[in-house]
Amino acid sequence: MSVLMAAMPIPALAQGFDPSLLLKPRTDSWPTYHGDYSGKRHSGLTQITPENVHRLGLAWSFQTGLNIPIKASPILANGIVYLTAPDNIWAIDVRTGRQIWRYTYPMNEGFHIGHRGAAVYKDSVFLTTPDAHMIALDARTGTVRWNIEIADSKRGYWSTNAPLLVRNHLLVGVSGDFDNLPGILKSIDPETGKTQWVFYSTPPPDTSDPTSGGATGGQMWMTGTYDPELNLVFVGTGNPTPVLNGAARLGDNPWTCSIVAINPDSGKLVWGFQASPHDTHDWDAAEVPVLVDANFRGTPRKMLMQASRNGYFFVLDRTDGKNLLTVPFATVNWTSGIDKMGRPIPNPAKDPAPDGRLIAPNEVGGTNYRSPSFDPKSGLFIVSAQDGYGIYFFKPEHGAYGWAGADYGVAGKAVLRAIDYQSGKIKWNHDLGDGAGTAGVLTTESGVTFTGDTAGNVLALRTADGATLWHSGIGRVGNSPITYELDGRQYVLVAGASGLYAFVLPEERQ
C-alpha cells in the first residue's frame, strides 16, 4: 500500500459529504457513478448549447502516468474529483486539475481487466480491487480506514464495480466467468465494513434450487440504480456458467441475464425479469437499468429501461417488473420470437456447436458496460451500440465448467443509436467507427449529447438528430463524460486514454 500526497490545500471535503445529497445532487457535483440514482446520465445544465459547444476549450488535464486505459467514470464531491484504475485511485482538485493524493493498492494476483469508479460517504471514499476486496479511505488524505474481502479471489472472483450508496448501505458486486461460481451482491456498512446481507442471483454453495437447472454465474458487476419512493435497488445480472455449454444447465437459469429488484434494507428479491433466458452466448444483462418517470402510450408510469447486451431494448414497469416493450436495437439473429412475458425466445439452432455458429450480436454484445443516457425532453434513449457477428464454438472436451468453449468476433461496427422509448424505433444513428465503442453517453437539457468514437475523439452531438457539433482528440474514451457547474461556468469532464480532461467555454469579456 502507498499514499502519495501533494503539498497543497485540501478543498471543502473536510466537512464530509452528506449522503442525503444523492437524492438531489447539486449542480457543482457528480457524487455517484451515474450522477444520481436514476442512471439517466442527464444534466439540467444549459450553459453549453448546440450553438456554442464548438467553442469548448481545455481548462486543465491530468495524466495518471499509467500505460492503461481509464474505464472509470469520475465522481465529484465537495471540490474533489476521484478517478480510479485497477489498484489505483487519485484525488484531484476540480479547480486546477492538480493531484491532492494518490492511493496504490499492493500488488496482487487479481484480474486487472478494468475499473468503473468510486463512491463517497461522509469523509470516506470507497473502491473495489482486482482481488475482490473493498477499501475505505480517508477522503482527505487517502489513508486506509478498513479493508475487507468481498469474495474469494482464489476461487475466481474479482471486482471492477463502482459501489452504490443507499443511505447506510454500500452495495457492491463482483465478477467471475472462469469458474462455476454463484452471483453475489453484498451490502456493506460504510462505517465499519461489516456485511449487512448477501443476495445470491444463483444458488449459493451447498444449496440447490430446482428452477436453476444447475446453473451458476449471474455476477452483478455493474452499478445499479435506486428508486427511493419504492425503496428498490435495480441491478443487472451476468451470464450463467458454464458459459457456452447450455446442455449442462437446462431451463431458463434464473436469475442470470436478468434485471432484479431488491429491497436494500433486507436484500430480499422483490421481482425479476429475465432478458436472456438460458443464455449460451455470454450476454450479460448487467447493463444500466435506467429509471424514468413519464407517460408510456398515454399512461403515467414508473419505468425501467435497459439496452441489453443481447441486442434487445426493454421497457418495464418497475413497480412489478411487467414488460411494456421488447424490440431489437442492434443486429440479432439468435431468437425465434418474443414470449408472452416479453422475453426473447432462444433459437436452439443458434446455440454454440463444435463446428461453430455465426451469431449476432458477437460476444462483446449489442452494447456493454458503457452507460447510456435518457433525454427527457426528446424522449430519446441514447446508447453506444454495436452491430456485429461472432462465431461461437462449444468444445465438449471442456466439459461443464467455466467457459466450455470459445467465440471469435468476425465483424463489428460501432454506432451511437437514439431510440424512441414509446415505440422502440430508431430515430437516428451516428457512426462511431469500426469495432466496438467504449464510450458511454451524457445528455444535457440544452440539447447536447457527449460521447466518444473509436478513433480517440470525445464528441459533442446535437441530441435532436445526432449531428456532430464539436470534437477533440484526447485518446480513446473508456466511459461516460460528466458535467458540473463551478463559479457560474459549466464544465465537461471526460477520461481519455490514461488521462482526464476538463473542457469549458471561454470566459465572457466584461
Where are these regions (language model features)?
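Structural recognition of the beta-propeller blade-terminating site
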Residues: 93, 138, 189, 263, ...
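Aromatic (tryptophan-biased) beta-strands that constitute blades/sheets of beta-rich domains
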Residues: 15-64, 98-107, 143-152, 194-202, ...
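Repeat-blade elements of multi-bladed beta-propeller folds
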Residues: 27-34, 67-88, 110-134, 158-182, ...
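Loop/turn-rich, solvent-exposed surfaces of beta-rich toroidal or solenoidal domains
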Residues: 293, 385-387, 408-467
